[in-house]
Amino acid sequence: MIDKESKISQDSFFGHPLGLRTLFFTELWERMSYYGMRGLLVLYMTIGVVGNPGLGWSNIEANAIYGIYAGMVYFLALPGGWLADNLLGYQKTVLYGALIIMLGHFTLAIPLEQTFILGLAFVAIGTGLLKPNISSIVGQLYSAQDERRDSGFTVFYMSINIGSMLGFAICGYLGERIGWHWGFGAAGAVSYTHLTLPTR
């Protein structure tokens, strides 16, 4: 006969609500794709058009575009949060954000200069929808009196560190050693993975 403590351990994620497992892996895959792609951006924009061809832009152009992109990621969190609060709800906003991020990464994987800015725009918009709202869902897993709340956020934030480390390593290797668009495509594949893998 299974005692109560064993039953709780089977129906939890490191002693936390099972919903944290879904959010942990969603954030891990999203951060892996985001940082994996981000690590390639300036290199891809400034590398010449021979060999493993990039865009061949100047450092000034590349840094300006990178800065605008990074700024938009954080700015778009404001309308992303508003949409979740007032129109769509947190779960739908996170899902739509993940889908748009995936679309952006696959657009970046197309070896055309004309689609590059479009892909960046998709990733920025999707991140603005997903990033501010997924943490809110973590908070909703716990009551205000639940002592596990702080440690739950610690577990959740571990996914950010793990995902960023894997993203830089995997997408960076593919981008530099095989081809930039393989790195961008890997980021898209990671996005697809976190949308399709079973979470229970």
What kind of region is each of these model predictions?
Residues 130-143:
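Intracellular juxtamembrane helix-capping segments at the cytosolic ends
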Residues 40-61:
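Short amphipathic helix-loop junctions that connect adjacent transmembrane helices
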Residues 67-82:
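Central cavity-lining transmembrane alpha-helices of secondary-active solute carriers
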Residues 99-113:
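C-terminal ends and interior cores of transmembrane alpha-helices
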